[in-house]
């Protein structure tokens, strides 16, 4: 009675820490794709300023906080999820978005939830090599594979590869540079052989390689090739995008390829399972898609799946469980659970509460005699909040980048690997002309006080990709004011207003550039947001020495 009273009052004295997880049973093993994408408040700002209803029940939380992670673990395992497949980034030794894993290994309840990596190798051409494969495998062995928390199958640590073709391309190119010819697929096989040898020398029985299946139709030759290369299983990412083609009967007359209802996803998922079940060459895990609405990232270029509800998601879960029972499938994967910016999220949030997690539990798990574990929020037991402090906003419109990014953050579909190195702000260009590279909310300043935007920077094309056919590269600056905000109604971007540009050189040398703003009719009012694109050359590396308004 005393504990119940304290619980009702939300007294922290009753629960000094996150209540211990209560496991639920299922005859199907459930993995969830986890994207550790919010290492700073600026990433949450993207959601807060566009789709605030997506706010997690943990708040705009510090994703590396072990206590917050213990809540994630508790909620996952109490709803049948037993492992996370975590996006893991490595680019020639450069690692990023490690904050969640570092916090996980300090979390009290980490023993309840295994993890393994989805090697997110969507890097620039030339990033993979024999030397790099040795280095990355060494890192895996020394830091992850021998820890009890790392997920294994038959004693083999599991590794999912995001883009095998990137790996294959670079190993084929490396061989060609030495006068050797490799056929498509042999590069992957060579890379895997390096890792297999190293893990066996370290006392492990091998690696359980998992493929990221790419096609919407069954392809027996594809499956056979993957097995020959060393893969042992497959999953599929983004099956909801195939809905317009595979389930036209579920599309409404007003639907388009980039805007359609979740009913089409409910209809499509079983068709994908049926397609992949036609072969037993490469075992696949039953995919449970969580939706898509990437307006916070893609704006005008977004794909929006509407009408997603816990009830409709529950229907997919029930069908998935029935499929597993019918065909003896013992592994399902929910993907992803926390892509907040892309609209693929089911972790407990303000919009749906625990509804999406409950749908998984109710479909796959055996209800205990005493009932399901109670869905507890941090505030219920006097814990939290775990929010980041507000994002830094530059007090003056000038940036030197001596030792920090000074409030700038990357556009997810525009810039990658943002960091300060050697006194410069560094990043590389992805999705040119789809988005700007970096952005910042600034302390509002009066446009009339400044006539010029100056930048000293270096643009270096990727050695393999070159200029990508861009003959006259330019840099762009976009600004927002109260009268003309950058993000307009419907999360659309007006590319015609509040933008200026100038030519740049992409030859690996530093130059100073200036954009004349004085004659631009939109350069007025109080500027409160800035977006910057260094150049439209895919994979180019950029180093910004300084920026300033004068």
Task: Identify the function of each model-found stretch.
Residues 8-16:
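Boundary at the C-terminal end of the N-terminal hydrophobic targeting segment
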Residues 25, 394, 411, 420, ...:
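Short, surface-exposed loop/turn motifs at beta-strand boundaries within globular domains
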Residues 403-424:
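Extracellular glycan-recognition surfaces and repeat-rich motifs
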Residues 157, 418, 423-426, 458:
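Hydrophobic residues embedded in beta-strands of well-ordered beta-sheets
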């Amino acid at each position: 009675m005393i504990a119940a009273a304290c619980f009702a009052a939300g007294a922290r004295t009753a629960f000094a820490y996150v209540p211990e997880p209560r496991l639920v049973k299922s005859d199907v093993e459930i993995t969830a794709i986890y994207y550790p994408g919010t290492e700073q408040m600026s990433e949450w700002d993207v959601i807060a300023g566009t789709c605030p209803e997506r706010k997690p029940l943990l708040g705009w939380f510090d994703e590396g906080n072990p206590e917050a992670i213990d809540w994630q673990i508790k909620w996952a395992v109490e709803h049948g999820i037993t492992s996370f497949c975590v996006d893991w980034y490595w680019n020639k030794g450069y690692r990023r978005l490690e904050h969640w894993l570092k916090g996980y290994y300090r979390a009290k309840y980490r023993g309840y939830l295994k993890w393994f990596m989805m090697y997110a190798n969507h890097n620039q051409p030339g990033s993979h090599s024999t030397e790099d494969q040795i280095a990355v495998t060494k890192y895996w062995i020394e830091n992850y594979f021998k820890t009890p928390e790392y997920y294994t199958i038959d004693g083999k640590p599991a590794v999912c590869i995001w883009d095998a073709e990137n790996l294959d391309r670079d190993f084929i190119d490396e061989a060609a540079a030495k006068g050797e010819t490799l056929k498509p697929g042999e590069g992957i096989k060579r890379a895997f052989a390096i890792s297999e040898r190293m893990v066996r020398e370290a006392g492990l029985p091998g690696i359980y390689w998992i493929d990221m299946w790419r096609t919407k139709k069954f392809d027996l030759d594809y499956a056979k090739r993957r097995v020959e290369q060393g893969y042992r299983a497959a999953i599929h990412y983004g099956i909801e995008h195939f809905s317009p083609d595979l389930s036209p009967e579920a599309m409404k007359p007003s639907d388009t390829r980039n805007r359609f209802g979740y009913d089409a996803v409910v209809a499509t998922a079983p068709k994908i399972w049926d397609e992949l079940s036609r072969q037993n060459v490469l075992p696949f895990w039953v995919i449970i898609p969580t939706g898509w609405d990437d307006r916070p990232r893609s704006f005008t270029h977004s794909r929006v799946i509407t009408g997603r509800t816990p009830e409709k998601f529950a229907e997919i879960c029930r069908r998935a469980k029935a499929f597993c029972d019918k065909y003896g499938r013992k592994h399902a994967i929910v993907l992803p659970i926390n892509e907040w910016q892309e609209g693929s999220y089911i972790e407990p949030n303000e919009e749906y509460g625990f509804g999406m997690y409950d749908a998984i539990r109710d479909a796959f798990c055996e209800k205990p005699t005493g009932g399901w574990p109670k869905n507890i929020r941090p505030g219920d037991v006097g814990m939290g909040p775990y929010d980041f402090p507000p994002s830094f906003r530059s007090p003056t419109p000038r940036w030197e980048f001596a030792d920090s990014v000074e409030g700038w953050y990357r556009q997810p579909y525009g810039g990658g690997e943002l960091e300060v190195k050697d006194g410069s702000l560094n990043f590389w260009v992805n999705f040119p002309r789809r988005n700007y590279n970096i952005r910042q909310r600034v302390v509002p300043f009066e446009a009339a006080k400044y006539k010029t935007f100056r930048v000293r920077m270096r643009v270096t094309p990727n050695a393999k990709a070159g200029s990508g056919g861009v003959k006259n590269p330019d840099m762009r600056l976009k600004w927002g004011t109260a009268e003309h905000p950058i993000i307009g109604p419907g999360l659309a971007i007006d590319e015609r207003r509040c933008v200026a540009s100038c030519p740049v050189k992409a030859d690996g040398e530093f130059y100073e550039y200036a954009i004349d703003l004085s004659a631009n009719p939109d350069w007025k009012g109080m500027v409160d947001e800035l977006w910057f694109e260094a150049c439209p050359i895919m994979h180019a590396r950029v180093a910004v020495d300084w920026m300033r308004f004068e």
